[in-house]
Amino acid sequence: MGPLHQFLLLLITALSQALNTTVLQGMAGQSLRVSCTYDALKHWGRRKAWCRQLGEEGPCQRVVSTHGVWLLAFLKKRNGSTVIADDTLAGTVTITLKNLQAGDAGLYQCQSLRGREAEVLQKVLVEVLEDPLDDQDAGDLWVPEESSSFEGAQVEHSTSRNQETSFPPTSILLLLACVLLSKFLAASILWAVARGRQKPGTPVVRGLDCGQDAGHQLQILTGPGGT
């Protein structure tokens, strides 16, 4: 790694500290995983999105967003090589950038959507490294994180591992609870309707049976007296 590259890396780290931005680095051709945490209660019922900021003051162009039905936010949504999934109970939205290319480098945002408004959860600066075989240089990338001058910056390095995880268990439990609750309510309604249809006929049958029994008993009691 040349001195110019190291200087640029230090400059980017200092800039990210000033902008409260997380720096993530990944190798070209491999995958990079981004996790944005948020307040689960504050952002309850809101969709999440991953967008790319165009320029320093430009708009943020949306890349991918979570499922339109909030209860299904744990399902993975894909747009090209970018995948997003949201664990709404844990308060973590995960974005996976597959097959990183040099053009994927840039400034991104994790957003919480509320109608037409978008609240920034986290800013992420993605760096794509061109030489995945140079382990010596890759190890040197951790120097800015250990430096006391840039203590507040967050720099991470990603390798090509199968980082796709299964569906978040908390969201699955929530979905199963809703399904079971809906089935219970449906069964209760059917039982109430069936019982309501039986009620009108029941007293009539019982009344006729009681009347016949009473008449039969009356004939038996008055029979000996009349003869």
UniProtKB/Swiss-Prot annotation:
Residues 193-227 are cytoplasmic. SUPFAM superfamilies: Immunoglobulin (SSF48726). Pfam families: V-set. GO terms for biological process: amyloid-beta clearance; amyloid-beta clearance by cellular catabolic process; apoptotic cell clearance; astrocyte activation; cellular response to amyloid-beta; cellular response to lipoteichoic acid; cellular response to oxidised low-density lipoprotein particle stimulus; cellular response to peptidoglycan. The keyword Cell membrane applies. Induction: Expression is increased during oxygen-glucose deprivation, reaching the highest expression level 12 hours after reoxygenation. Expression is also increased by ischemia, where maximum expression is reached 7 days after ischemic conditions. Disruption phenotype: Mice exhibit a strong increase in self-grooming behavior, defective social behavior, and some sensorimotor defects. Aged mice show decreases in age-related neuronal loss and increases in synaptic density in the substantia nigra and the hippocampus. They also exhibit a decrease in the connectivity between the retrosplenial cortices, subiculum, hippocampus and anterior cingulate, as a result of defective synaptic growth thus impairing their function. Gene3D superfamilies: Immunoglobulins. Expressed in the brain, specifically in microglia (at protein level). Expressed in macrophages (at protein level). Expressed at higher levels in the CNS, heart and lung than in lymph nodes or in other non-lymphoid tissues such as kidney, liver and testis. In the CNS not all microglia express TREM2. Brain regions with an incomplete blood-brain barrier had the lowest percentages of TREM2 expressing microglia, whereas the lateral entorhinal and cingulate cortex had the highest percentages. Residues 19-171 are extracellular. A 1,2-diacyl-sn-glycero-3-phospho-L-serine binds at H67, T88. InterPro entries: Ig-like_dom_sf (IPR036179), Ig-like_fold (IPR013783), Ig_sub (IPR003599), Ig_V-set (IPR013106), Immune_rcpt_domain (IPR052314). The chain crosses the membrane at residues 172-192. Residues 1-18 form the signal peptide. Changing R78W: In strain: FVB/N. Monomer. After ectodomain shedding, the extracellular domain oligomerizes, which is enhanced and stabilized by binding of phosphatidylserine. Interacts with TYROBP/DAP12. Interaction with TYROBP is required for stabilization of the TREM2 C-terminal fragment (TREM2-CTF) which is produced by proteolytic processing. Interacts with PLXNA1 (via TIG domains); the interaction mediates SEMA6D binding and signaling through TYROBP. This is Triggering receptor expressed on myeloid cells 2. It comes from Mus musculus (Mouse).
